[in-house]
Amino acid sequence: MIPAVADPTTLDGGGARRPLLPETDPRGRAAAGAEQKRPPATPTVLTAVVSAVLLLVLVAVTVLASQHVDGQAGGVPAGEDAVVVEVAASRGVAEGVSEKSTAPLLGSGALQDFSWTNAMLAWQRTAFHFQPPKNWMNDPNGPLYHKGWYHLFYQWNPDSAVWGNITWGHAVSRDLLHWLHLPLAMVPDHPYDANGVWSGSATRLPDGRIVMLYTGSTAESSAQVQNLAEPADASDPLLREWVKSDANPVLVPPPGIGPTDFRDPTTACRTPAGNDTAWRVAIGSKDRDHAGLALVYRTEDFVRYDPAPALMHAVPGTGMWECVDFYPVAAGSGAAAGSGDGLETSAAPGPGVKHVLKASLDDDKHDYYAIGTYDPATDTWTPDSAEDDVGIGLRYDYGKYYASKTFYDPVLRRRVLWGWVGETDSERADILKGWASVQSIPRTVLLDTKTGSNLLQWPVVEVENLRMSGKSFDGVALDRGSVVPLDVGKATQLDIEAVFEVDASDAAGVTEADVTFNCSTSAGAAGRGLLGPFGLLVLADDDLSEQTAVYFYLLKGTDGSLQTFFCQDELRASKANDLVKRVYGSLVPVLDGENLSVRILVDHSIVESFAQGGRTCITSRVYPTRAIYDSARVFLFNNATHAHVKAKSVKIWQLNSAYIRPYPATTTSL
């Protein structure tokens, strides 16, 4: 049992005592995490009039967002330049989103009364994460490298900031950060994809061809079918034009599979053995008993397909598997390296090679993965641990992260992971700001050879090229209940690397087991335990009325061993009440002799964190209203009741913007 203690206070640099976490910071009704469905949209004559007014507001907000100037002094008081507008009916389906969406289903009533200002809304747009110029975006699709350019396709609604009219947006980059927008790659213009050009994957063939398999939602029945497209000119480095096959659809739902439970084909792989030269493609599904499935098809020409004799894998009770991904991993360096150690998708199974099977679970909107062994003779996959099988074990990310997709980068010989980071604000706020969703920072993926049981994810090494001025804070003592401000200047675009050490005698002196702790059901950073929480507060204002806490929490297990949780607390991230605010996190493996380490990327309304070299990752969408522009701060804190903590090393860099923009027609360089 953890003893009750008084509220923590500390002395800051000026000698004034301040509360670590103020009691007067209501979360709003969304903070409990309940996701409420919207009533069906009902267009009216009034809606048409309101839509016209809304359009004028959106133009103003979009102009402000596009300028993205982060140099204003001080925060913006709530209510100044407030945007007050009725919300037009959603252009999405009745609930306002699709079954492919992970946006919070907030109600249209009392939760939508926050007075957002234009300055607040403009500040939320990210500076170095990928976003389209405007409107709704979801899954990353078909990433690849071609003739000097990285390509990213993505699910996009060109007409609105809500889901609908899904097309394929397209952008290119030399470095995975500085993106140039190209014209649409594919639009819903055939009966087999009239209701949406949904997710898919690219495969590069030995002869240089690039084939793109994608899911289409059909015009008459909204059935999910698989379609083939190829570049009109594969010699074009920008792959600006795509041609859909006359053979489409090339795959339809098989017997026993529901017509809307058959989607998101993987990158094809091939491991030739004897006369078997067929490519394998996996597709996500579920059966009538709600087991999640990965179906496998074999093809020589990507037009004609034969089903494999057995399922690649199935896990009872996990429901529909979306955006299945399947790829090999080799022994890495044991640390989160920026390049190398990746394997091409068709790498042959064998000693030292494992295969990752990942599924995005439609039931809970999280990305789960497992490590196992692939048998190309039977096209089946077996997890190394049944307890850590797909959908019941490890996740890529314990925060807001979904519909991910990897690709192999032949230049730096690495596997790169993309993930969709949806919004957790209201649809009304999305419409006001004119956009919804970002892509995560691309991450390298390696097998963690120190544990052998998990992946390591780390921001691609190119992120370090965005670093500008930096500061170091070494050997900072964090007494129990303390908060220490760090003077880093502008604190809205940051790369933070921190290493913490807990006094060994404090940890050894704890004798009581604490087996009930869980990040998501805890009180967040406000809760006090014997050995935690401690870490950093980012996007915080001076009086800590807004803050996003990234922290460790240590506890003793029943066997006397120390366990380490890594958590991210959004409960006080914003004063706005039209948000879903949660505490995310999970256990993170910490090996003997390792200090506690974390890397944090802060980019306006998104915070991505990587603990212990990327063993556990958490992504949050946060929407500060006070800790914005020059009012954003960074703090160290220790809210433990028993542990003395030292921040051995804290390095913080300001990051430049990526200046994502349309592709210039007169040049092919950045």
Swiss-Prot record:
Residues 1-40 are annotated as: Disordered. It is found in: Membrane; Vacuole lumen. Pathway: Glycan biosynthesis; sucrose metabolism. Residues 1-112 form a propeptide. Residues 1-44 are cytoplasmic. Residues 66-670 are lumenal. Substrate binds at residues 136-139, 155, 163, 198-199, 263-264, 322, 362. It catalyses: Hydrolysis of terminal non-reducing beta-D-fructofuranoside residues in beta-D-fructofuranosides. The keyword Signal does not apply. It holds the Pfam family Glyco_hydro_32N. Glycans are attached at residues 165, 275, 518, 595, 639. It is a single-pass type II membrane protein. SUPFAM superfamilies: Arabinanase/levansucrase/invertase (SSF75005), Concanavalin A-like lectins/glucanases (SSF49899). The active site is at 139. GO terms for cellular component: membrane; vacuolar lumen. The chain crosses the membrane at residues 45-65. Its EC number is 3.2.1.26. May be present in two forms, a 70 kDa monomer and a heterodimer of the 30 kDa and 38 kDa subunits. The ratio of the levels of the two forms within cells appears to be regulated developmentally. This is Beta-fructofuranosidase 1. It comes from Zea mays (Maize).
